[in-house]
Each structure stands twice: as C-alpha cells, then as structure tokens.
Amino acid sequence: VDVAGAHIHYMAWGEPGQPGLVFVHGGAAHAHWWTHVAAQFASLYRVAALDLSGHGDSDWRDDYSLDTWCDEVVGVAGHAQMAGAPIVVGHSLGGYVTMASAANHPERIAGAIVLDSAVTAPDPEMESSRRSHFANPKVHADMETAMARFRTVPEQDHYEPYVMRHVAAMSLKPVDGGVTWKFDPSVFGGSRRSSADGLLPRVTCRIALFRAEHGQMTPTIGSYMYEQLGRVAPVIEIPLAGHHMMLDQPLLVVTALRTLLADWEHSVPFERT
C-alpha cells in the first residue's frame, strides 16, 4: 500500500472481514520478526505485520517520524480489509509507533499493546551509541556469512534458533559485492523514548503494557507509564524474557496476547481517574 509517497510492504493472515490485529516491529527490524507469532491469531482475526518505511521491503524516506509511521499503520489496517478499528501490537520502536497511532487516530485504533517500549527522559549518550552501532551497515560476501554475524541490540543470553535463522535471513538484501542489511541507518535520527512521553495521556483506547523480565521497561518505568495512562493499563511481565521477547519467549508472548485479547473481548474498559 502507498502511504505519503512511500510503498509500504505488509503480510496478512486470516480471512478478510474479521476483526483486525496489526503487528509493528522494532528499530532496524522488519515484519518477519512477527511471523511466528502473528500467524497464531489468523483463526479469529485478520492479521497484518508491516515493514515500517526505512525497514524490510518498504521504501526509504528522506526523514522519519512517529507521526508518519503511525500513518503507515493506519494505512495498512485500512488496506488489509479488517472489520472495524484494529488492535495494534508494537515492540520497542514499534511500541512508540503504537502509542502514536492510538493518540493521533483515536477513532481508528480499538486497542494498543506495547511490548517493552520504555518511555524515559532523553538519553543523548544512549541515542548516540545506537546511531553509531547501526551506521554504515557492512556488506558481507554471502548469506551464510552475514547470518552468522546477525546480532540483536541489545544482545540476549537466549534465542529460539529457528526464529533467529528466519529473522536473520529475511533481514538481508543483495547488493554489489554480496549482501547487506535492509534497514536505512537514518531511522535512528531522534529520541523516540522521550518523544513518546507526551503521547501517553492522550491515549483513550484500551492499552496494555508488556514488560520483559530482563528487558528495558523496568518496574519503575512501567509504574511511571501506568500513572501517565491514568492507571487503567495493565502492566504484564513476561517471565524469563529479554527485550526481544518474541525471539526468546514466543509461546509466552502468544499466551499473554491471547489471554489479554480474550479479556478485552468480554469486559468493559476502566475509565481514567
């Protein structure tokens, strides 16, 4: 689908006309980080996982913003033939995009589930380190060499090997001299952690926070975000999980999502205090 002059690639599962579920990946990642999770919901939902611009098989832009990325989420949801407003599930950078989508398009988002996206004050040292880490992606001679070099940021002690191999393979594209990573290094041009802070009080749809036990959303940060959301958002810890919880604890993530979605289907939302 075309959004604001860029072609946005997405994958879809489930029958058109079912309630919608949209999965949004993190920074330097892509839609295939979600395939082994998203497909589990196809019997009840029309499911989509997109490549944000600057990632995966979507076009690159001259500049990037949360506002543009959330327009892409809404555009994919509309194009994928979902019944009514979808629930959006976002990890890391995708969690900030999910918050922006809920805040900017309240009439078009039914719910938001944010996975280990820590909203904090600006940290120039962290942002500089992240930009330098992803600057100038290397060209590798072949797929196997590149896949052997694949690492997440931050790194974790455990991953499911079958997931990592698929994710690594789908992260690469052919170029002169071999293969390189698909993402645009300039997507790391600003602080998403701090820019998301003002979004939280504006979210009016259902929202839930998933916190990885060994991730970046600490209990203190989770409590702060809970307060900013008017004390109506459950903060759910995924045990044993690192920041990239779909790579090391995918079954726990699927179970937590199924439980939450079943509750939302049969319950009345709390109102903000």
What do the predicted segments below correspond to?
Residues 1-22, 43-45, 82-84, 234, ...:
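Alpha/beta-hydrolase fold catalytic core
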Residues 3-13, 36-39, 48-89, 255:
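Active-site loop/oxyanion-hole signature of alpha/beta-hydrolase fold enzymes
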Residues 26-36, 47:
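Serine-hydrolase catalytic-loop signature spanning alpha/beta hydrolases and amidase-signature enzymes
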Residues 90, 94, 98:
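Gly/Ala-rich beta-loop-alpha elbow adjacent to hydrolase catalytic centers
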Residues 99-103, 110-143:
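Flexible "cap/lid" loop of the alpha/beta hydrolase fold
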Residues 141-194, 199:
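Conserved alpha/beta-hydrolase catalytic His-Asp/Glu region
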Residues 206-241:
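Conserved loop-alpha-helix segment in the C-terminal half of the alpha/beta-hydrolase fold
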Residues 241-250, 254:
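Catalytic histidine-centered segment of alpha/beta-hydrolase-like enzymes
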